[in-house]
């Protein structure tokens, strides 16, 4: 799940967590990893994530967040740098197009066995269901 905002507030983080839970039809994500930004150490964030396993990167150590840092570089390089972004609405549409119409659905990823994230996740679900059927 994702949320685009021009402010760094805990409400945006909580909105994204709720979107992820709804999309996956689960009550709690297994692990939430973040940096130590103020929105991730707030009392509200701690309350909402009390039943989740939270992981934090070391302060001023971006290598702990290499995956998301790489993603931010990728979305800029592959998509956003092609445009002169006019306003928030334009930025939102561009991010939506990249994530929902390309990155998650069509773009292959080496760490997903050269499948899109959506295809990889669907395969994972089918394997899990098959294993449950075979075990039971």
Located regions from the model:
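Two-metal-ion acidic nuclease core segments, chiefly of the RNase H-like superfamily
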Residues: 46-53
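A short, conserved beta-strand element enriched in hydrophobic/aromatic residues
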Residues: 1-20, 30-33
């Amino acid at each position: 799940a994702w949320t685009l905002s021009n402010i760094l507030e805990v409400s945006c983080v909580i909105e994204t967590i709720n979107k992820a839970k709804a999309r996956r039809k689960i009550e709690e994500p297994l692990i939430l990893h973040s940096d130590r930004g103020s929105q991730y150490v707030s009392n509200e964030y701690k309350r909402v994530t009390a039943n989740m396993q939270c992981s934090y990167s070391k302060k001023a150590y971006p290598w702990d967040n290499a995956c998301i840092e790489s993603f931010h570089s990728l979305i800029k390089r592959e998509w956003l740098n092609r445009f002169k972004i006019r306003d928030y609405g334009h930025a939102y549409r561009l991010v939506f197009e990249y994530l929902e119409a390309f990155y998650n659905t069509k773009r292959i990823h080496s760490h997903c066995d050269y499948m899109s994230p959506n295809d990889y996740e669907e395969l994972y679900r089918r394997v899990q269901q098959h294993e449950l059927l075979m075990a039971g």
